[in-house]
Amino acid sequence: MFFRNGDRTDQSTKNVMTTCIFCAQVYEMDRAAEMKSGVLIWLPEIEQHVLHHIVRAIYVGRISQGPMADASRRAQDVLLARREEAKRRLGTDEANIMAMVLRDYITPRHYAQRTEKLKGVRLLPLDRRIIQESGLQFNQFPQILAYWRSKDGPFGGKIPAQWINFYQEALMKANS
């Protein structure tokens, strides 16, 4: 959940918005840094929400075997390499630094221009989500990944090895 006013104790319907875990961390980049769950990349050719769908498929595909796992690892490497351009343009790829600058160091006039100035910068979701609870730290991501792959998850139990068949069927239907 995302809390529009930043107050996690305000559970009113006007304040609470449901989001996927990847979208939520875009709104709270400082938390993404705390959980070690995202880094900044330069990727102007892909919108943020589309990147989330791509990355989710990459992580599900990566834990399979065979060509789909190899392709997923290569795709992840390509995305991670885009960190360098973010560092070159912004001086950092760390989400918490971006959040701090936006929150504490720029004037209202510059803040109003953030969309234009940061066009092309994306928060790349990583394959970890470090949660602290009762003095313990654990990586929640394996559980999230297991859900995505489950019959109730967004991939509906469809194993990555079958994805090429789904794509080919969709392509044939689109062309007929």
Predicted feature descriptions by range:
Residues 1-19, 27-35, 39-42:
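Histidine-centered nuclease catalytic patch
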Residues 81-176:
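C-terminal, charged low-complexity interaction regions
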Residues 22:
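Short, cysteine/histidine-rich loop/knuckle motifs that typically chelate Zn2+
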Residues 7-10, 49, 132:
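A generic structural micro-environment signature
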Residues 25-110:
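PEST-like low-complexity intrinsically disordered regions enriched in Ser/Thr/Pro and acidic residues
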